Design a protein with these regions (language model features):
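Structured-RNA-binding interfaces characteristic of tRNA pseudouridine synthases
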Residues: 2-203
């Protein structure tokens, strides 16, 4: 199943270590098609979004950096707005960083949509206050063609109203242990789901 994600961040009270001397922290919004990638995080024997972005940085300014993201998407998962931070030489303007990274990322299906100087203490992962996810299901007899790889095709119809009613049981704070992978690195399986909507996109 394909999953679209958006990582959203905003500043918390906590302050995290900043960049080294001569570097500045750049906050960026990254969009990618994760079909051919093992996920966000670097892997030893498979391409990842993180590795591809870090290699683009090295090609741009010669630095080996660690790209930090608001969330770690899994294999095959896309993002329309992953929040990332990079510590880069401070003399580069945000526009220069965006243009250079996009040039070095081509032809990979990864694009830097926006770049700005991060506020002091900002950290893409630990300053995140929420994350949003979009799951798309194509419900029809004919298989997916234009959206292949971006939807979960199911050749039956659904009762959307019943699905929405059932989804409400997941809203709130719950222990999601049965949903987490064996290698999950989250400190706690207890999470708060603020909103869950099941909607028919079109008929």
């Amino acid at each position: 199943m394909s999953e679209g994600t958006i990582g959203t961040t905003s500043a918390k009270a906590a302050v995290y270590p900043g960049p080294a001397e001569g570097l500045a922290r750049y906050k960026m919004v990254v969009e990618y098609n994760g079909t051919d990638y093992s996920g966000w995080q670097r892997q030893e024997n498979a391409p990842s979004i993180q590795q591809t972005l870090e290699e683009a940085v090295e090609a741009f300014c010669g630095l080996q950096v660690l790209a930090q993201a608001a969330g770690r998407t899994d294999a095959g998962v896309h993002s329309s707005g992953q929040v990332v931070h990079l510590d880069l030489p401070e003399h580069h303007t945000p526009m220069r960083v965006m243009g250079a990274l996009n040039a070095h990322l081509r032809p990979a299906p990864i694009a830097v949509r926006d770049v700005e100087r991060a506020k002091p203490g900002f950290h893409a992962r630990f300053s995140a206050t929420s994350r949003r996810y979009l799951y798309r299901i194509q419900s029809r007899r004919a298989p997916a063609a234009l959206d292949q790889g971006r939807v979960w095709w199911v050749p039956v119809t659904f009762n959307v109203e019943a699905m929405q009613e059932a989804a409400l049981f997941l809203v709130g704070t719950h222990d999601f242990s049965t949903f987490r992978a064996a290698a999950c690195q989250a400190k706690s399986p207890v999470k708060t789901l603020n909103e869950l909507r099941v909607e028919r996109a079109f008929s």
